[in-house]
């Protein structure tokens, strides 16, 4: 992900998912945008950000991979016209490529997957993450039901959770 008010967007607007001849759609705050992971240059960039962090700060033991935005624009400036219908699949393949590289170089790094709604977890992403954040709802009673429901489909050891004060729904 990126932001329309970032150096990355200024230097590489072609690295953002966007529909040709349409205004750019944005997420939270009116500035959030999604990187085009079908593009190998973008994959390299994302890996380099993590690699640089891990090189500069080798004591990092945990990282939360928060992708709290859905794909707002179903268009890739990188992909040819005949491949646009495969955007979602190719985007996830690009993400998998990045995650494979991170896992290969930093196997000790604990990674937590986190994203909005149904984009939070899927079976294809589980091999790359040690755990996933199931919900921002931290009310203790609601969390019991939420964790129980998710456990019907995913291994409980992979579900991260914490609870907060009573009547707290974040």
Q: Where in the sequence are the language-model features?
A:
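Active-site-proximal beta-alpha loop/turn segments in soluble metabolic enzymes
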Residues: 31-36, 73-86
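An active-site-proximal structural segment forming one wall of the substrate-binding cleft
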Residues: 35-65
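Residue-level detector of functional hotspots within protein domains
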Residues: 48, 53, 81, 95-97, ...
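Glycan-recognition surfaces
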Residues: 5-44, 89-170
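Catalytic grooves of carbohydrate-active enzymes
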Residues: 56, 61-62, 67-72, 161-170
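Generic secretory/membrane-interface signal
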Residues: 30, 60, 64, 71-73, ...
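Active-site-proximal loop/turn and secondary-structure-junction residues that shape catalytic pockets
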Residues: 1-3, 67-73, 115-119
